[in-house]
Amino acid sequence: MRKYFGTDGIRGKVGTTPITPEFMLKLGWAAGQVFKENDKKILIGKDTRISGYMFESALESGIVAAGADVRLVGPMPTPAIAYLTRTFRASAGIVISASHNPYTDNGIKFFSAEGGKISDELEERIEYFLEQPMEVVESSQIGRAKRIDDAAGRYIEYCKGTFPIGLQLSGLKIVVDCADGATYHVAPRVFSELGAEVISIGVNPDGLNINEFSGATKPELLRKNVLAEEADLGIALDGDGDRLILVDRHGVVRDGDDILYIIANHLMRTGRFSGGVVGTLMSNFGLELAFSETGIGFSRAAVGDRYVNEKLMQHGWVLGGEPSGHIVCRSITTTGDGIIAALQVLRAMVEEGKALDELLVGLVKFPQKLKNIRVAKRFVPNEEPTLQKAIAVANERLNGLGRVLLRASGTEPLIRVMVEGRDNDTVDELVEYLVEEVNSVVSAKADT
C-alpha cells in the first residue's frame, strides 16, 4: 500500500505534508537512490507556480546528495518533460506541478526513461527509501547539476515535427490560452511557426496566477476572445500543458470527448485508423454510440490518464482520452499532450477543409451533469450500503438510457456525482437526489 503516491503522483497544499521543502529534499534523495542504479542522470522540470522554485532546489539537493546528476530545464509543459527525458537518455524525469489546481497547491510526477509513468513497483521503492535515514554520499561522489538552456526550442521543434511538412496553418486565426502556466513560452510559437495568426492570452505568469482566470478549466475568457476576434479556433491548455479544451468559431466550448471524436474519425476517413478508442467512466454515452455507428471500437478505463494509457497498451490501441481534455496519441507521444492533440485537430480541419463544428456532425451527446462534494474523510461511495441503494434507484429511473457514476477523486478530497441521460430534467433530479444521499453519508461519517 503506497503512503504518498496517488493516482497522479504526489499532490497537496504547499506547506502541508508532504508538500514541504523537507519532504522534497528526502524525496529527491530517495529518487536518487532508486534511479542512480541505472544511470546517474535525472531531469527536473516545473510549471510556473512560485513554490516550484523552492521545491526544485530541494529536489536537486536531495538527488545530488544521493550521488545522481541533475538536469534542470525550468518551466516546461509536463509532456515536454516526458519527451526530454527520452531524448536526454535520462533514467527518470520529475515534474513539479499540480496541473490544473491553483498556485497554493503543488505536486510531483515521475516519468520513466521511456517517457511513461513509472510503475507501482518503482513508486513503492521510492517510498521505501523515504522511510530510511538519509545518508549523503562521499564528497567525491556527490552528483552534479546542470541547466539545459535549449529545452524549449527542442520541444517546439518536436511538436512541429508531428504536423505534416506539406501542411500549413496559413489563413487560420487561433486564440491560444496558456493559463499563465508552463506552455506560455512554447505553445504560441508552435502554432505561429506553422503559419497561423495567433492571439495569445494567459502568457504572463507571475507565480501566483496559474489557472486563476483562464485555461482548460476556465474557458470563458477564451470563449470571449474567440468571438471578439472572430477567430477560427480557441485552444485552452491547463497549467502544465497536458489538457486541451477547444472553443469553436461560434463560441461553443468543446471537451475531450469532442476532440477524441474528431481525431478518431479523421484517422478513419484517411485510412490511418486501426483498433479503437479508450475513454473513461466519465466519457459521454453519446460518444460511445457515435463510435459504434461508425465501426470504431470503444473501451472505458478508470478516470486518470495513467489508466487510459494502461488500457491502450492492453488493447494495442493508440488513441484515448478523458472529457477533461487529457488526450493521448500513443503513435506520437507517450503521455497526454495538449499541444500535440490540438495539432491533430488542426490537421483534420486543414485536410478536410472544415470548421471545428462541422467535424462534429454525427456526435450527439447525452445531457450530463457533474457535481463535486468536498469531504473531510475520504471513502469509497460504492462500498456504502446507503449509496448502493441510491444508485440502484437512479439506474431504475433511467431504464437503461443513461449512466450513474459516484466516485472518489484520486487527487482531491472530493466525491464526484455524475448522471447522464436523454432528458435534462431527469438528469437534474437524479443528481440532486444523489448529492443529498452522499451528503447524508458525509454527515454520518463526520459524527463518528
From Swiss-Prot:
The keyword Ribonucleoprotein does not apply. Pfam families: PGM_PMM_I, PGM_PMM_II, PGM_PMM_III, PGM_PMM_IV. Mg(2+) binds at S99, D238, D240, D242. It comes from the Bacteria. Binds 1 Mg(2+) ion per subunit. The modification Phosphoserine is found at S99. This is Phosphoglucosamine mutase.
